[in-house]
Amino acid sequence: MLKRTLVANRGEIACRILRACREAGIEGVAIFAGNDSGTLFTELADIAVELEGDGLAETYLNQEQILQIAIENDCDSIHPGFGFLSERADFAQAVIDSGLIWIGPSPEAITKMGDKMTARITMKEAGVPVIPGEEVDGGLQEVLDVAPSVGYPLLLK
């Protein structure tokens, strides 16, 4: 059973996670940048810790600082929310390697789903329906040749 979860996010998603923690009897730890001081998610937390630094890279994306705060506050788990560090396989692995519980997809799943082509192949292999598409390495004529089988409107990337 989890006892204390650090929420590595801010705003509405942090509020939702902190409320869910409270309902489950889990203490919630919020991290916040200086400009988020006094906002609702910091008020909902059992513990709120201000991040050092300016800007996202030094605060909400600073993996080492966030892990250190979790450890110093006796957290047993980290919930990333979405965005920010939730899509970073290296952060998920660092959380696991530090002995904490990562509340999210495995680092392997994050890696597979982070690359669109790998995600598409993985989903097809798992029998999940995917939107028709083609990987085209040729020129305009190849695009024109496969376009009818893909369907319109056609998005090129």
Question: Which sequence ranges carry the predicted segments?
Answer:
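N-terminal beta-alpha lobe that positions the nucleotide/phosphoryl donor
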Residues: M1-L156
